Regions:
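N-terminal Rossmann-like dinucleotide-binding module
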Residues: 1-48, 72, 184
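Rossmann-like dinucleotide-binding domain that binds NAD(P)(H)
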Residues: 160-244, 318
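Beta-loop-alpha module in the N-terminal Rossmann-like domain of NAD(P)-dependent dehydrogenases
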Residues: 48-112
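Hydrophobic residues in well-ordered beta-strands that form the structural core
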Residues: 94-95, 120-122, 231, 260
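NAD(P)-dinucleotide binding in Rossmann-like oxidoreductases
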Residues: 209, 224-298
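A contiguous active-site-proximal alpha/beta segment in oxidoreductase catalytic domains
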Residues: 2, 100-163, 170
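C-terminal helix-rich "cap/oligomerization" subdomain common to oxidoreductases
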Residues: 1-3, 8, 28, 68-73, ...
Length: 354
């Protein structure tokens, strides 16, 4: 059995999950980590027995024995330079979404990975959620026939929304609905998006932060086969809401309908101290004693296996770029009040990039 050595850049919430998952995997020999928070760096190094622990990610790229790098760093503006440097160093790369901030950056990463013959994948973890995988299967095997109506609505709590929105100027489309856009495009392959219309709604987030941050964003996407669908996302659930993330999915086809309640109401905890809570309701998931509840561990194992066993990755750079172009178009549409046609013209790309 071939073992590989993994480097993890950024060991916060998601990076920590991926680091611990790698530590438990028999295909992984050594773990090397880079983290700018020295307290967290020391904590994770002790927890996983890291071979290298550094505050400078470039140190990992100089280690020839590292086969692959997982980039879980924030803010999102760091994604492109870190991924570019890792690919140039000859490392296979797993990169958290978004793939980049500008489409030209995404194109450069995709081309570089191909040139170097390296695995390059993006963290769209919901593809590894069994409920979502079931929807994909039901479409592929014809259970519900040809899709004619699709709706996905996702909302997270206000406290988590402030944390995410405060990192970088990205919209609910870019930071929340991005997962659902990827999911629907995956289900509808090989159809491609050709038109995007979007509107945003303001309220609690702008009032509480003072920034130009919408509470919700709704997106209608038209595909090249004529089908249109709606994706909505927001981050303003009340602070007392008992879970982190709540999602509703509708797929109606010519031969059936499939509804998915991913609001995490299946396990309800109520205590005198904290009131009602819905455990295991985060999008990445969480460790529960001996087992991991959620998609992120499966996703991490998938990448490790792809590198160690030379398998194809499930999420390609091209697919992540497509999602990025659509949420950029959604933001432009919300700003102008008009539909936006794809591919995005050069002048619109310049406007989107400020």
């Amino acid at each position: 059995m071939k073992q590989i050595n993994i480097g993890v850049i950024g060991t916060g919430w998601c990076g920590g999950i991926r680091t611990e998952t790698a530590r438990r995997n028999p295909l992984v020999n050594e773990i090397h980590i880079a983290e700018t928070n020295e307290i967290r760096l020391h904590e994770m190094a002790q927890l996983v027995g890291a071979k290298t622990a550094t505050t400078n990610y470039q140190d990992l790229l100089k280690i020839d024995s590292i086969d692959a790098v997982i980039i879980s760093a924030t803010p999102e503006t760091t994604h492109f330079p870190m991924a570019r440097d890792a690919l140039n160093a000859g490392k296979h790369v797993f990169l958290e979404k978004p793939i980049a901030i500008e489409l030209e950056q995404a194109d450069e990463l995709i081309a570089l990975a191909k040139k170097k013959n390296l695995k390059f994948t993006i963290g769209y973890s919901q593809r590894f959620n069994p409920k979502y995988a079931y929807v994909k299967k039901a479409i592929n095997d014809g259970t519900i026939g040809k899709p004619v109506s699709i709706l996905v609505s996702r909302h997270i709590t206000r406290s988590l929304g402030k944390k995410i929105a405060g990192r970088v100027k990205l919209s609910p489309a870019a930071m929340e609905s991005t997962h659902d856009l990827d999911f629907v495009f995956w289900c509808l392959e090989p159809a491609k998006p050709v038109k995007v219309y979007s509107q945003v709604n303001y309220g609690a987030m702008r009032e509480s932060t003072g920034g130009d941050i919408p509470d919700t964003q709704w997106i209608m996407v038209t595909m090249d086969n004529g089908l249109s669908f709606v994706v909505g996302g927001g981050w303003s659930l009340p602070p007392g809401y008992p879970n982190f993330s709540s999602t509703w999915i509708e797929f109606v086809g010519t031969d059936g309908a499939l509804m998915v309640d991913d609001s995490h109401k299946d396990v309800v905890l109520n205590t005198m101290k904290n009131g009602m809570q819905l455990p295991m309701s985060t999008m990445p998931g969480e460790q529960v004693d001996h087992i991991y509840a959620g998609p992120m561990a499966y996703e991490t194992v998938h990448f490790i296996e792809a590198v160690a066993m030379d398998r194809e990755v499930l999420v390609t750079g091209e697919q992540a770029r497509q999602v990025m172009e659509v949420y950029m178009a959604a933001d432009l549409s919300a700003e102008t009040g008009e539909p936006v046609y794809l591919p995005l013209p050069t002048e619109m790309l310049k406007a989107a990039n400020g």
